[in-house]
């Protein structure tokens, strides 16, 4: 660590990456955020749809909350995680979209001609995507608060749910990023971020897991999203249930590591000279 | 091995289906030289440049750029080489100052230094007034100039320009030429440029290589190559081919070489101007009436015709073909 902080000239071999990796990553992230800010059209629709879902679900099912949930529990807090997860999934496409954009306009090749680290080329858009996910989640939480949300865990509950949303979306980003790097096609990449949309419905979407039966219950039990959903619900409805939160974190890790393994492989495919 | 040289030995790029885009190409670019790589579309120019600039790997063969092996020392090659590719890769929503500053920082400059360098370069390519406009709103010529500035950020020793003037209007083309000359003379940069314009290769290059169908057809100084054809030519056009044939058999002994191109008889010889009276007398004697008679210095087009047996692609047609593609990009 001390080596990085010393401003002394580095030997030539070190200089091949002129800038420390973390600086390259922050710069690439900043660059992608600038681009996203100038092309907001790619982010706004996903956000609107998620807020719309929240309104519809709440309006159509909140009347049944006394029957579905315990007495006095809010259906809003129960359904909010579904909206957050669908926002994470649609927001996960952002990183892939911006990589494909660079491939199409040729800037990706231009970057490959500089000594920039390949890891920075991947992490820049992914981290920018994470910032967007945090923003989206925060907006949805704000709307939910206006609708009367009062999390059982208070302000920290908001933070925990936000962290879950960002982690889940960032993990899923690996899929769209892989497709972007492998195909260089915008159409294929936007398709990839919808491929996992069914997962949000093969789970305890509208009612608690105990109310499900048959194949849907089996599917929900196998679906890692279920555990993310339950962790969020516990935080918002009941309090710090560490067992549920632990299962949620494991699920998020599984849902993130697999896509990122593929993404690293795809990065290598794209940047290896042929 | 001088640091600003390019040495290419038996370079081959084969694609699937046994298509040889570059087929056993060897050449040497001396330090501080402008080297023109001339050839029609699809001859292998861009493929060569992508290998030399580390974007693609040769199927076989060797290449050293500035003393570094393009295969094993790609990172070092990237540090000393500046590259402006034919397809300008600039993010349309970014602004020129942002792109240049980032480029400088990626090459290891501090933020302050790269801003300073960026402003210097914007001045140089006359874009200082347009730093607030997204690059997507630039004209073709402006984008080309910015792309050149991008290639110069890290003060490269060797500059690669892939068709730097394709799709540009004549005035912008002259600007690029002037800048290329300046970089070569004032900064001592070795410049490797590909072009499909004979005039451009002739005008700019110290030495050229003509590449056709993946192979180098000829290499040398433009003047030397032209001189090698027998200096100048007298071109006599007749009303029909048989008359031209008749004239050739009568005149062939007087000249170094006589060639018929449609209805025109080309007589290649030294000091052609002195020979005109004799040619005219001979034609008079035989009562062969020419439609026109001109004297020309050989051009690279003639060189191309001689080494490949075919005419170079018509430049006008080529520009028109290119124009719509440029507009889309």
Give, region by region, the residue ranges found by the protein language model.
Chain B
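Walker A (P-loop) phosphate-binding loop of ABC-type ATPase nucleotide-binding domains
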Residues: 40-44
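Conserved ABC ATPase "signature" region
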Residues: 101, 105, 112-130
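Conserved ABC ATPase signature
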Residues: 134-138
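Conserved catalytic motifs of ABC-family nucleotide-binding domains
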Residues: 155
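Catalytic Walker B motif of ABC-type/P-loop ATPase nucleotide-binding domains
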Residues: 159-162
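ABC transporter nucleotide-binding domain
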Residues: 178-270, 294
């Amino acid at each position: 660590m001390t080596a990085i902080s010393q401003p002394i000239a580095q030997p030539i071999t070190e200089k091949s990456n002129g800038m420390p990796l973390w600086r390259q990553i922050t710069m690439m992230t900043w660059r992608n955020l600038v681009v996203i800010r100038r092309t907001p059209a790619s982010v706004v629709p996903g956000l609107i749809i998620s807020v719309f879902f929240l309104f519809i679900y709440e309006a159509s099912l909140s009347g049944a909350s006394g029957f579905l949930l315990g007495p006095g529990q809010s259906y809003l807090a129960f359904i909010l995680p579904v909206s957050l997860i669908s926002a994470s999934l649609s927001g996960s496409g952002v990183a892939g979209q911006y990589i494909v954009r660079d491939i199409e306009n040729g800037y990706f090749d231009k970057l490959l001609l500089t000594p920039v680290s390949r890891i920075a080329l991947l992490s820049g858009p992914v981290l920018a995507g994470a910032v967007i996910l945090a923003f989206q989640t925060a907006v949805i939480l704000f709307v939910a608060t206006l609708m009367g949300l009062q999390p059982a865990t208070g302000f920290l509950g908001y933070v925990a749910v936000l962290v879950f949303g960002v982690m889940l979306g960032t993990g899923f980003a690996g899929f769209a990023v892989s497709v972007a790097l492998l195909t260089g096609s915008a159409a294929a990449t936007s398709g990839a971020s919808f491929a996992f949309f069914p997962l949000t419905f093969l789970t305890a979407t509208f009612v608690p897991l105990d109310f499900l039966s048959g194949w849907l219950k089996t599917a929900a039990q196998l679906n890692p999203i279920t555990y993310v959903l339950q962790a969020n619900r516990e935080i918002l409805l009941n309090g710090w249930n560490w067992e549920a939160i632990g299962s949620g974190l494991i699920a998020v890790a599984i849902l993130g590591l697999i896509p990122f393994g593929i993404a690293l492989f795809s990065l290598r495919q794209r940047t290896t000279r042929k | 091995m001088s640091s600003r040289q390019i040495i290419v030995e038996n370079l081959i790029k084969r694609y699937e289906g046994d298509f040889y885009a570059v087929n056993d190409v060897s050449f040497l670019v001396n330090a501080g030289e402008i080297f023109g790589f001339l050839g029609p579309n699809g001859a292998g120019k861009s493929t060569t440049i992508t290998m030399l600039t580390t974007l693609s790997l040769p199927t076989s063969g060797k290449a050293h750029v500035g003393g570094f092996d393009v295969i094993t020392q790609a990172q070092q090659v990237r540090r000393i080489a500046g590259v402006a590719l034919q397809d300008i890769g600039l993010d349309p929503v970014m602004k020129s100052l942002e792109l240049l500053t980032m480029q400088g920082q990626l090459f290891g400059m501090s933020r302050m230094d790269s801003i300073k360098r960026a402003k210097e370069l914007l001045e140089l390519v006359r874009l200082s007034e347009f730093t607030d406009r997204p690059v997507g709103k630039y004209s073709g010529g402006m984008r080309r100039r910015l792309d050149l500035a991008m290639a110069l950020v890290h003060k490269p020793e060797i500059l690669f320009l892939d068709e730097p003037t394709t799709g540009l209007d004549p005035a912008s083309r002259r600007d690029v030429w002037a800048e290329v000359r300046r970089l070569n003379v004032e900064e001592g940069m070795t410049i490797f440029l590909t072009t499909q314009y004979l005039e451009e290769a002739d005008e700019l290059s110290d030495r050229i290589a003509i590449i056709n169908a993946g192979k180098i057809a000829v290499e040398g100084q433009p003047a030397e190559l032209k001189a090698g054809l027998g200096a100048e030519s007298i071109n006599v056009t007749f009303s029909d081919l048989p008359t031209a044939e008749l004239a050739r058999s009568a005149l062939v002994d007087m000249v170094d070489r006589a060639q018929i191109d449609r209805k025109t008889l080309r007589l290649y010889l030294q000091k052609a101007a002195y020979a005109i009276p004799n040619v005219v007398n001979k034609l008079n004697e035989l009562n062969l009436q020419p439609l026109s008679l001109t004297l020309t210095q050989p051009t690279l087009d003639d060189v191309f015709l001689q080494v490949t047996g075919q005419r170079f692609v018509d430049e006008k047609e080529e520009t028109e073909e290119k124009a719509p593609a440029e507009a889309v990009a």
